Amino acid sequence: MKFLVDTHAHTIASTHAYSTLHDYLNVAKEKGIKLFAITDHGPDMADAPHFWHFVNMRVLPRIIDGVGVLRGIEANIKNQQGDIDFFGDYLKQLDIVLAGFHEPVFPPSTAENHTQALINCIESGKVDIISHPGNPAYPIDIERVAQAAAKHNVALEINNSSFLTSRKGSEKSCRAIALAVKEAGGLLVMGSDSHVAFSLGDFDKAVEVIEAVQFPIERLLNRSPEALLCFLSARGHDSLDEYADLV
């Protein structure tokens, strides 16, 4: 199966990434990708875009040359309370909100602290997807997190870059997460976590994890633009009508 939806990509607005929105659009058209999200790092990261970057995403057309572009963020989980570095009504202006641990903002701690931070973040209702929860630098109680995510309709990400250039040693935990989410009746999403446009929509390693645990395709958000958009609508994002031509 070819997956035509990517929920995790960084532009040069995050200065450790190397591609523009136009670069991503060109690659999306070449690969046949129908919908992707721009999710630059939240403001608490040292090289993140200014807060205004996210506020002003309203100027972006939602469909460009036949490709849907979701206005998003990869926010930083800041503390054990599960707080993130984006807030209030501004969150409602975004189409998709990812959040995860990043060492400059939340230094690795204990498994219990990591677990409680993720559960609190999930329960806050502010976040749609937990990014790279399989990072071995942040061990968690996988079953508790998977159950909380399923209960609150939050997706957990299998991050393809975790098997390539980042977060080495993620394979075991990602497989355990996929299995736990399957058993909890929850949702998974694959993210390329692209920091350069060439890798947009690349999920080869993530697909291996999904297939290894025989994860139900009907609970994988990448299966179609419609699946992701329905999920986001159910999560309370109410500005998605402009994407109707994609489904």
From Swiss-Prot:
EC code(s) of this entry: 3.1.3.-
GO BP annotations, alphabetical order: bacterial-type flagellum-dependent swarming motility
CC cofactor: Zn(2+)
Residues binding Zn(2+) 2: 16, 41, 195
Record note on cofactor: Binds 3 Zn(2+) ions per subunit.
InterPro entries to which the protein is assigned, alphabetical: Phosphatase_YcdX_put, PHP_dom, PHP_phosphatase, Pol/His_phosphatase_N, Pol/histidinol_Pase-like
GO MF entries: phosphatase activity; zinc ion binding
Disulfide bonding pattern of the chain: none
Annotated family: Belongs to the PHP family.
Pfam families, A to Z: PHP
Position of the signal peptide: none
UniProt keyword annotations, A-Z: Hydrolase, Metal-binding, Zinc
Any one Gene Ontology cellular component term annotated for this protein: cytosol
Source organism phylogeny: Bacteria, Pseudomonadati, Pseudomonadota, Gammaproteobacteria, Alteromonadales
Binding site for Zn(2+) 1: 8, 10, 74, 193
Protein name: Probable phosphatase swp_1620
